[in-house]
Every structure is written in C-alpha cells, then in structure tokens.
C-alpha cells in the first residue's frame, strides 16, 4: 500500500549441532512446554517538532499464514475439530505488520531511539493488532505533541532476524552472467545455530547413488535451507558441499542458509557456540518455532514426519498450485516462491534486493517442488543432460513415501516471507535454472543435504525411497496414484534463448489424490513426460513477477500438465493475487476448495480490499492473469480435446503460442484482472480486459450503421467460443459470471461468436494504434483497440486459439476451413456486391494464409486500401473505386480548426472572445521575445516548420505546447500569424467594404480621409473589428520599438498591407492599382491606432492630420494593358527610331519566361526615354547614338545640297571628308535609286566600313566570312551603285553591311536586284570582284554602343583615311546591331519571316532619280571636291533606312557641316535635291 514492504522471513537458524538438552517445539515433532522468554517490546516517547513532526515514516506489510495452516484447519474442521476446542479459523487471518521505513536524523524519533526496521506494536498504548494501516496512521496523526510508541526492535523481532540487514542494502542492480557465477548475497548478521552432524550420514550416502563430490554444487540450492536449528531432529544431519566456493571438503554448515555468503559463515560473522550470543540465538529460534507451531496446527490423524515449516508462497507460485500431503497453503505476500515437500515447507530468508540481483523471482509449484532443489543437488547435476528427477510424495507416506533424497517432509528448510519490492521487477538476460532454484540463490554455496531413513519419526510407515529417472526416456514413472497430480518446476530461460530439450531442470512432483485427472495422468505416463522437456506449453508462458513480460522470454519456460493446475485449483487454499495497486501487496485468489473455503475467500477479499485499489504492477498482474487464464484453459482441456495426440500436441506445439504462451508474451490486460478471480469466472474465462471497439460490418457483410461505427470502450471477456462485450466490468462471482456467460447483461451487446473467425492486426487503421480486426464466420467485422502492442497480440492469439473447431489440430491452420470460408465469402460478396469500408489507406500486407484471405475478400471490393493491386476483386469495384476513395477521404479528412476558416468559427482567446486564439498566442509570443528582434515580420520563417504548426493547430489549438522548439523561433511565429490572415476566407477588411476603403484613402482632404476611414472601421463586423483592433495595437507596439527592430510603420505596412487589405478574389489588376492604397491604409492605422480604435466619441472632433506628405506613387498605368497577355515589343504607332532599340533588345528575350511580359514593358519605356535623351545630348556633345552616327555621316556627305538647318560641331563635320567616294562628273546622273526603308529597326543606320581599293587590293579580316545574305547584299550594292566607264576605277566608299538589313527583308532584296539588273554595266563584274577593305578582327562583333571620344584630325578630302580613322568608323555601330548579328543563326527565309515580320515595316519606294551605275562613277574619276560631291547624292539616296524626318534632318545637318569650299559643287545637282525632297515629302 504505502511504499515498499519489507521482506519478512522466518528465522532460518544455521544448521548447527543441536544440543540434546534444547527443548523442541511442536514443529520439531514434539510438544514444547513453553517457549523461551522473549524480550518484550520497547516503549518510546516522541515529541513532535514544528519542522519535522515526529521524524519518521512507516511502511505496511501483510503477513499471511502458511498455506499448510489453511489445510490443517480445513482438515480439522472436516474431522470435527481437534479436541473439541474452539475453531482455529481465526489463525488464518493475515497479520498486518507496520515497520519504520525511515527515521530522520536528528529528529524526535531519532533522538528517542527509533530505528529503521523497528516494528510497531502499540500506538499510545493501543495495540495495532486488528487495525488497518490507515487506522494506525490516523492514531499517530491524531496524537498530540507527544507520541508513545511500543516497538519491537529490528534486532529482536522474530520476523526480521532471518531477514537481517540485506533488506536495507543498496545495489539492487540485476546480475548478468553465468548461472554458476552469480555473486553471493549480502551478508546476514543475525546469529545462527549449528548442530553437530548426526551419525546417520552414511545412511544418506548409501541412498544417493551418485557421490556428493560428483555433484556440481549449485549455490542456489534450497537444499541448503535445512534448518536443523528449528525443528530438525537431532538425528538429522546436514551435509554442506562447498566445492562451488572453492572449499574442498564438506564440513558442518555454519550457516546452511542459502543466501548466507562465505563471509557470513566465518567465525567473525558467527560466534562460536557458547559465546554470549548463544542464549539469544537459542531464544530466537525457540520463539520462532513456537510461533510457527501456533500458526500451523496439525490435523488429526496426520502421520507425523520430521517437522518442517510450511512453505509460504507468493503470487508467482500461486500460479502453480501446490497439492501435497498438506493442502496448498495460503500465500505470504512477502515471499516470492518456496517449494516444500511434505508436512512443512522450507523457509526462505531471501531479501528481494538479492532476489532482484539474482534476476528472477523464485517459483515453486507444490510441496513436490521441494524435490527439485533437493534431488537436483544430490543427483540431478550428474544427470543434467538426460534425466529429470521427480519425487511423488503424497499426503500419506504409505502411499508415496518421500525419497531419501528429499529429507523428510518436515526436517528441511524454514519458512520465509518475501516482499514484492520494485526491485523484484528487475531481471537479467541470463535466466537458466528453475525459478526458485536459480534466481534467489545464485552465487551461494551448494548444500547437499543427506538424510537417512532413521530421520523419519516412527510414524513413517516406510522409509523414503529415491526414485531414479531413466536417462533414456527422461521420464520418471512413480506409482500410479502418484501420477495423478504432477507439477513440473518450469525453467525461465534467458531472453531470446531457444528451446532446450534437456529436461534436467524439471521435476515431476506428486500431488494429493483429491482430484485425480486420469486422462492427463495417462497422457503423462504415456509420453514418459518427454514433452515436458519442451518449453512451449501453457504454463511456460506464465511471466515471472520480477520481470517485464516480453513475448520472447516465457515461451521457453517449462510447462505444467493440465491436471497439475486442475488438482491444485481444487485443493488449494486461497492463492495470492497481485494487488492492482502496488507490486508490494497481494491478496488471496479464490479457487475451488470446498464449501468451507468460501468464508475464507470472502474474509480475505474483504479484509484487504484497500490493498488492491491503487497503482498496480504490470509484471505481477501479468503473472496472475496468465496463470488465471491458463488455469481456465487447462481445466477445460480434457473435455475439449478428447484425443491424447491432440493433448500432446497442445503441450508440445511451439508454432501456435497457444493458450497461455501467447497471453503471457503479450502482456494480458492490466485493468481489473486480479479482482476477477471468482470460482465461476476462473473456470471458463480465457481472457478479459478493457478494449475500444467498433463494428464495421454486420451479418452477411452489410455495412454497419452510424451508431455501430463509433468507437466505444467496453469490457471484453473471452470465453470458450464467444467474446462478450459490456459497458462495465462485472464483479466476480458465480451469479455475475453466469449472467456474463449467458450474455444477459442489460448494457451488454450480444456476444460475438469467435468460432472459425479470422483475426489479425489491422494494418489499415492509421488513426489508432494497437488495433486488430476480427471477422466472424457470418461475415461480421469488428475493430478492437488494445492498450498496447503486447495486449493486442495477446488478444489476437487468445482469440485464435479459442476459435478453433473441436478436435482441430492446433499445430497448423485448418487449410480446408479457410478454403471453404474463402469460397463462401466470395459467393456472398459476388451476390451482394462490394461493400465499402472506412479504412483510410492501403494495407501494408497481412502475413499468413488468413491474412491473404482477409485481403482477398470481395466484401472489401471498394476498399482498395485493403486489396493489393493484383487482387481479383479489383475488377469488380473498378468503376466505382476512384470516386469512392475520394468520397471516403473527403469524409475522413477533419475540417481545419484554425486556418482557412472564418473568424467567427475560430477558437476564441481567453482575454477576448472575439479574437482568435492563434492570433492572441502569436502576438503575445512576439511581444514577449521579439520586440527587439531586427526585421520581425519582415524575415520569413522556415516554411516546413510553419506548415507543421499549421497542421498541428488545425487538429486543435488545445494541443499547443509552447515549450516545443518550433514555438521558440520568432520568425516562424510571425510567419504563422501572417499565414493565418492570408488564409482567411474573408479578409480582415471585408469584401463589401474593400472599395470603400480604397476610395476613402484617395480623398485629398486629410481630415476627411481620416474620418471616413474611422467610420468604415467602426462599421466592420464585431469579430473583424476586435481582431483588427488587437492586431493594429500589436503592430503599434512593434513600431514603438522600431529603433531596435527596424520595423517602422511603413515597413510593417509593406508586410501586412497586401495580407489585410485585399479581396477574396484578389486579382492582378487590383494588386497593381490598389497596392499603394493598401500600404497607406495599414500605415495610417498603425500611426493613429489610438484614435481609430478609441471608444471616446469626443476624439472625433480632434481628427489627427497626417503631417507626412503623400507617398510618391509610381506611374504604373502603362503596365495595366500588359496584365494577363504578352504584348509585341513594337507598337505601330510608336516612333520608329525610338522603338528600334527596344525592339532589338526584346527580340531575344525568351517569350516563355513568366516575368518577360512585365520586364519587357518596363524595358521599352526606359529604352525610349534613354534614346531620346541621348539624341538630344548628341547634338551638343558631338557624340551620337547608333542612329545618329550614321545620320551624321550622311549629313557630312550631302554637304551643301541641303539648306543649313543647323550646325553640327566639328567632329561630325570632320568625319565627312574621309567617307567621300571618288568624284564624279557634275553632269552625270545616277541611276534610279531603289530605297528600302525599314522602319522601327536600328540596324539599317550603320554603314559598312569596308573599303574597296582601286587595285582590287587585299582582303583583310579573313575570319569575317559572309553568309549568303551578306554575299548577296554585297553584290547588290556593287552592281547597283557601281558605274561602268572607261578608265574608271572603284573608289573607296562606304558599302552596305549585310547585317544592316533584317534577315527577312526579302522585299528590299528583290527591289534591289531588279534595280541592279537595270543599271548593271560593263564594270559590274569588276565591282563584284572588288574585295572589301581590311577590317580589324573583332570589329564586326564589337559591342561598343557609341564613340564618345572626338576623332583625330580627318585627312584631307580625297586622301586615304588612316587606320585609326577606319577603325573609328567601324566602331560606330550600335551594340544592338552588333549583338543582333552575333546572336543571329542562319535560318530559312520562311522561319525568319515568321519571326521578324511583326517587328518591322518595309516600304520600298521607287525614286524618280536614277542611280549612278558603276560606269558613271568611273567617268567621275578625277579627285577634288567635284568628284566627292558627285558621289554624295547616291550616298544620300542609299541611306534608305532613315525615316523622312530623320533624312531631312540629316541632309540639313550635312549641308551645314560641309566646308564653304564645297558648297559650289553642290549647286550642280539641283535635280537630286529636288528628288530627295520629293521622296521625303512622299514618305
């Protein structure tokens, strides 16, 4: 109940030679006149202090009387009592003992002399006997400042002398290692009494075939428990073999107590007899003997054997009943397990500390279990590989005298009490031996007890006999009457250890003949006990109490035949059940005894009801549940399985973890299992516990209704072929059990028939864990959720085992049944059609044939999540599968609870019911930690973390854990807040008032604008107004700390403007046109939040004025037409010159880029402005743009032909002479001029700088290979512009570069070719053959846009230009032209036409003037100004890429820039001037 109870043990004195004068008590086989005097209790007076109170704490422990006492008293009552005295039934009442748990140093209790371990006897003069623990606590608490305690000192308490100090030792860590190397237990410092070995040792040696020296000593042998000092006759001799401890010769055991280490047996630990300690030693032993004799009176007519204390047992052995000459005795809470054979059991003085270190709780089955340590110490070790020893003593020695290897039933051992301390729960991975033999006594010296038949009293009708096992059969065949009840000590193997077929560690133990089980007995005889060696049967699954149950441990434990439990259940007194409240306490398990046992059961249950109401231990409960379940199974086994072969397979089959194996491995239910141990339920309940349940399909595979598809918590009780489900757990009892079995509960649904059912883990259930699916034979389907995985597996295996048909071999699944069921299922599914299911996702695959069947059922036709892709039923439900799945998923998907819902539906904050909780939480976190965080709300958080928080909040804001690291990132919190407002279905500024806010913000009058905004805000709905008020106040707080976080109102407005002020159907147009208004509205609200949201109406008269000037709004009207469409780069109405550069830039912008449309619009405008500005500056600075550079060249060439409209600075005029061609005669007329005017493109503004030398010269720039287009254009230029004349030669002149024309300007080429054909003369071939002048490498691809340096002094007219001048002229091309040539790839004419036709307009005008052919240019040979003048008209006419306006300007500028000496030459060409003027006028 409270704390960890002490381990109480009897006093096992050291086996010393008993002086003949020492009086023997009744337990020694003789009556004792009176016990030796025992020191009385001490009385202490404690005074309460204000700080510490009384300064001590208590612990409660319940001591049950030995089980032998129960049977003795029952027998006496059956025989009418002994001597007609009063009924000793009162002796069966458990005894409450209260010990001092802790004493505070320096406290009142410490000063008064109270010590840890002292046992309370009286409180304030009032005895605690008969009082509960709570009543004793109440007495102490109700005391005044003075408390009088009567205590039994720990050193003098008979209940603790054997326990000694090891109960208080630390270091309960489990030991891991070899079984033979388990360390010795802590020393015991209480006195022991040794006796001289009797003279009958040779008789024992003769009775044991193997010499003792040949036996490998087992330090854990309970054989060493013989307690000659207490009730062992003086004739009894104990042999101690210390070979395991390195001692070569046996000697009288100074401390034959099993957990006594070697140090404790030294003279310093135990004074020699005769010392001053001896009297107290004798008194202690005699008092304990007297106390025990009072506890266990002998029944009348009982044959006396050497006295031996009854074995006290704990919950772990309660699972293995004890049927011997004495009926199984009541359990002691304090001991784990002790085996006893005969009239009295061995006492154990094992502390749970050491037991935990020994790694396992001890378990004993019955008095026969005593055989295990005794015989195994004497002869078992040598036969360990092949033989299993068994003794079958019965209640009557004449029937089955105990073997000599067993020392008499009464002359061995001591009674012990062990506690269920938490250290019990500890275990190691190496568990080798029998339960009580291995775990509590590891590391102790091996004690081989020798005893002769003379040790038996005269009442013994025949001497004991040693029954030798047959190594070949590994079986012991005792007399038939002894085979009726046989219990085998099971072995607890280490974790994961495989089955060991050696039966050496098993013992067959004889039981009484009250409940014979002939079938089970015959079965055991027939199989020579061999299957008992297998470790796969039911009782092997009983988990040890001191370990966490695991599926892999207990499967290997040794099993117990069914009749063992059956007989023990019929004969046993109440067996301890683990308290559900604590591992410390147990209570009596009610079993079948007789009619007289009902009162005992009721008394025990009622006496310690409180002991089972608090917390409970998993492992203890598991053990009891499993034992209870296995007991039920085994009791029904003979009637259920008529075949002996089936029975044998039941015990030996390991493939189906049957009956109890699965259940212990799967941690049986932990709810209220220990309290359901009534007579009726114990017989037929296989498993029970709390489950969550819902029904999926009703009979014939029909979909269950909505009410049945809800998860409900039920108490499930699994019986033979049914599973009962009730809302409440039924109290144990025959009536309740009968009602439950009949399904008569009012709140209980009809039991689920599990016969031939299919059960497996429900892998498709993803929302709940530990769910298994049950499909019955009539096609009903259920889902059950267990508490944990072990519980789920336990239920599955239990249902599988109980669902088998009668006589079905449990070794494998019934294939025929499954096939038949599968066929029936398919027939039903095809006739009734596919059924829908609620499982959301696909199955991960169910293992085994049954699982395959579950996946293939057509009832799940629509459940594609249950079927593999290749399932046969896919075709049945194929048409409906897609929408069916979508509907299921949509229905299953939980609606969001935080994001994407209206403000009215959000969970409200505590401080303001109209503000969403998520908004309040985020704002509070930011205000608490982020006021000084730089860029708060501007720096985004991690998108993945924000998304995870959104999902968490959508599941329910109640799950918010602010300690989660995701809530520690301020940027994540700020992004979460922005995401909340961004996902609102209706924005904070509602849709119906959005336009009003935009219009109000555009009011010119500042005061009026503020008033209008305030009125609109007040008109918002309640939730929206309150949320906006809360948010703006928060942003105001952030802005107040802008000097640290750098977030001024404007910055916050840039962040929250688009999020708050928007429409539900936000579009691009609104975003572009209203973005400045959105910013301004939010900024105004933040700046004047107090005025906007103030409840004071008077403030309306003091309207604040926005002192700041309105923000400059960029002119973005030109972007509006481009929204949503791709606009061609050129506009027909735009200026051809200004747009040409933009066209060239836009021509290679990828059209597929999403941002191209916006970038093009902006680039066009900027390019136009830049061109215009440069053109204006070019006139004053002497530099020119791409177009102007060519215009200036033509102006210089035309010279005096144009009226002087303007003067150009010197550089442009100086360049002109260098570009003049050889002179022509004034009277020559050029040929017809074909002009190709390509508007809107700037590449025609550049002239080719290659010069043809008179000699036909050299070709430089070998790398500049002309393509077809360039070659064709060169021919056109030379043929058209050249003249044929005698003696004439081709002079240096600028020629058209091929890249000056657009790739698709085929119309211009056609016109030029036709003109060339008309004007071609004798010198055409020479003109064609004229090579281009030298060109420095790289000049054609130069990207220099303009030359800003003034050129060097131009050479005289008619002189050859220098290389520097030629290079300067070549670099005049624009970057756009050069880049266009470089990027252009040769394409087919049609492709080029499709690509470029939309960017250009080609106008070909036939000039009224005739162009000069090559011969005419030759006749104009002679240098001088006249020749140069004669060429200019053609040059002017050749510049067909200029618009009319630009050409006019160029001619005027060129004429003004010519020197005065050239003006006279221009007067001879009046027709050309007039023709040019007419051309411009036409254009």
Swiss-Prot record:
Biased composition range(s): Low complexity: 1338-1351
Secreted listed as a keyword: no
Location of the PDZ domain: 71-155
CDD domains named among the record's database cross-references: PDZ_ARHGAP21_23-like, PH_ARHGAP21-like, RhoGAP_ARHGAP21
Phosphothreonine PTM sites in chain numbering: 652
Gene Ontology BP terms: signal transduction
Phosphoserine modification, residue list: 361, 372, 421, 515, 579, 607, 619, 655, 658, 673
Pfam families in the cross-refs: PDZ_6, PH_9, RhoGAP
Position of the Glycyl lysine isopeptide (Lys-Gly) (interchain with G-Cter in SUMO2) cross-link: 850
Keyword Repressor: no
Bias (Basic and acidic residues): 316-325, 1099-1110
Bias type Polar residues, positions: 331-342, 1133-1144, 1236-1248, 1440-1457
SUPFAM superfamilies per record: GTPase activation domain, GAP, PDZ domain-like, PH domain-like
GO function terms (MF aspect): GTPase activator activity
Superkingdom per UniProt: Eukaryota
Rho-GAP domain boundaries: 901-1093
Chain intervals for the UniProt region annotation (Disordered): 15-34, 212-276, 300-345, 385-407, 448-485, 508-527, 827-848, 860-879, 1093-1150, 1171-1361, 1419-1469
Record keywords: GTPase activation, Isopeptide bond, Phosphoprotein, Ubl conjugation
UniProt site positions, description: Arginine finger: 938
Domain PH per the UniProt entry, residue ranges: 684-804
UniProt function note: GTPase activator for the Rho-type GTPases by converting them to an inactive GDP-bound state.
Protein name in the entry: Rho GTPase-activating protein 23
Gene: Arhgap23
